[in-house]
């Protein structure tokens, strides 16, 4: 599936609106940006397997690791990777659901929720 950037951005916005308020409220201070593909250097730095698609990543300092005296140097950002999501999804509904799951996972990294807890909440 290939979408224009404008169409993809609309689906990202719809997916974000589907996220429960208690999780979505944490987006107030997080920038969300869409990139076509993850940078290969980023994948290598993360130790991410090259044969697994990376759908999104949180870049910043998680709340539970912040210092009261030293604020983060850069804004917290969630990157959504359009190319891998388009390749993975067969329908617009599936794409919207995967974007929602991806954004929730990245918010979880920001607020310190573990992968195990996300599974318990239904976000696998």
Mark where each language-model region is:
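Short alpha-helical catalytic segment bearing the HExxH-like zincin motif
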Residues: 98-106
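Short hydrophobic/aromatic patches at helix-to-coil boundaries
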Residues: 120-124
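Active-site rim/adjacent substrate-binding subdomains
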Residues: 1-98, 110, 116-119
């Amino acid at each position: 599936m290939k979408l224009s950037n404008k169409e993809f951005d609309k689906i990202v916005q719809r997916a974000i609106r589907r996220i429960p308020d208690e999780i979505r409220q944490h987006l107030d201070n997080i920038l969300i940006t869409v990139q076509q593909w993850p940078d290969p250097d980023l994948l290598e730095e993360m130790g991410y397997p090259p044969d697994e698609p990376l759908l999104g990543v949180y870049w910043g300092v998680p709340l539970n690791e912040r210092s009261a005296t030293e604020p983060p140097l850069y804004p917290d950002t969630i990157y959504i990777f359009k190319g891998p999501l388009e390749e993975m999804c067969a329908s617009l509904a599936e794409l919207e659901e995967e974007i929602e799951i991806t954004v929730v996972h990245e918010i979880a990294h920001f607020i310190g929720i573990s992968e195990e807890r996300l599974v318990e909440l239904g976000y696998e």
